[in-house]
């Protein structure tokens, strides 16, 4: 089966193009993903961002630090919980959001060229199911447990 290889190729190609196209706004190496989620989820904390994007906390911490140093996001102490820092896009970060969404919309339209609306919806539903299946294993491994490959 080569389904995950195909998904990986598509994801890497889209990410590579986005990274090139976002260079002129000083976004590098997937930082646009973090900025979009922070704009869409004002007050999100890093752990929630990690879960949302399915990346480890240290990767989130590095990207958040870079976005903050560029003035695109800011951290604020959460009300009643000084340990958690809520993340918010600055006005500068919010101004990039429509541009990033335009790239996303264009890429999705290109990727789905030749698909009927029904086929596109079916693909979205199937990929959501794949994501949920992977999420279960991701949660398991994230907690230090091992997956069982015994019946593969």
Task: Tell me what each language-model feature is.
Residues 65-128:
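Charged, amphipathic alpha-helical coiled-coil/dimerization segments
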Residues 46-47, 58, 65, 85:
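Residues within helix-turn-helix
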Residues 117-152:
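C-terminal regulatory/oligomerization modules of transcriptional regulators
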Residues 50:
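The alpha-helix within a helix-turn-helix
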Residues 8, 36-40, 101:
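Short, locally clustered residues in the helix-turn-helix/winged-helix DNA-binding domain
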Residues 1-25, 141, 152:
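N-terminal leader segment of winged-helix/HTH proteins
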Residues 41-45:
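Short capping segments at the starts of secondary-structure elements
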Residues 13, 17, 33-36, 95, ...:
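Pre-recognition alpha-helix immediately N-terminal to the DNA-recognition helix
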